[in-house]
């Protein structure tokens, strides 16, 4: 909610793995705030197959936890920020996976807010161009990927680092 208030010109669509929590009385006040907000809604249509992919493909920015769809979006050059904190934890998975040199991990709300504002000011093409090195480091992004050679190069690099 705070992010949507800070970015009134952006439209936020929240998509969850499961939505059964929407019927829990504890969340009633938060849900009421979301309903009142003009630039935020919860995607609750689970009858259509692959709606998450449709939402991602039409988004200016994807904010997600560490998920496979987040990786898929990054591999296509979509602007992604990784929400890697909760009420009492931060850096839950980024201590293992950091995606450097990509600056996409958010360990607290201030980082999420700052990075969101920055990304919303640029185009997807600009995001992709500015992050080409990091995107190419983690994903097979050539038009005709030679998967076998790419994997072999990565394995060789790992062996060199391990001095094996």
How should these model regions be labeled?
Residues 9-10, 78:
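A short helix->loop->beta-strand "cap" motif at the edges of active sites that frequently abuts
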Residues 68-142:
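Catalytic binding pocket for nucleotide-activated donors in carbohydrate/polymer assembly enzymes
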Residues 141-164:
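C-terminal alpha-helical cap of glycosyltransferases
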């Amino acid at each position: 909610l705070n992010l949507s208030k800070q970015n009134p010109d952006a439209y936020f669509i929240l998509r969850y793995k499961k939505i059964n929590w929407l019927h829990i009385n504890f969340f009633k006040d938060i849900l009421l705030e979301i309903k009142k907000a003009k630039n935020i809604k919860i995607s609750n249509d689970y009858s259509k197959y692959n709606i998450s992919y449709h939402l991602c493909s039409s988004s200016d920015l994807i904010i997600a936890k560490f998920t496979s769809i987040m990786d898929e979006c990054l591999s296509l050059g979509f602007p992604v920020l990784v929400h890697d904190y909760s009420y009492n934890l931060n850096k839950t998975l980024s201590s293992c996976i950091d995606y450097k040199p990509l600056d996409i991990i958010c360990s607290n709300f201030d980082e999420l807010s700052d990075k969101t504002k920055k990304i919303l000011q640029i185009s997807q093409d600009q995001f992709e161009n500015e992050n080409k090195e990091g995107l190419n480091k983690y994903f097979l992004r050539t038009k005709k990927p030679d998967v076998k050679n790419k994997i072999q190069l990565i394995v060789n690099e790992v062996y060199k680092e391990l001095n094996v």
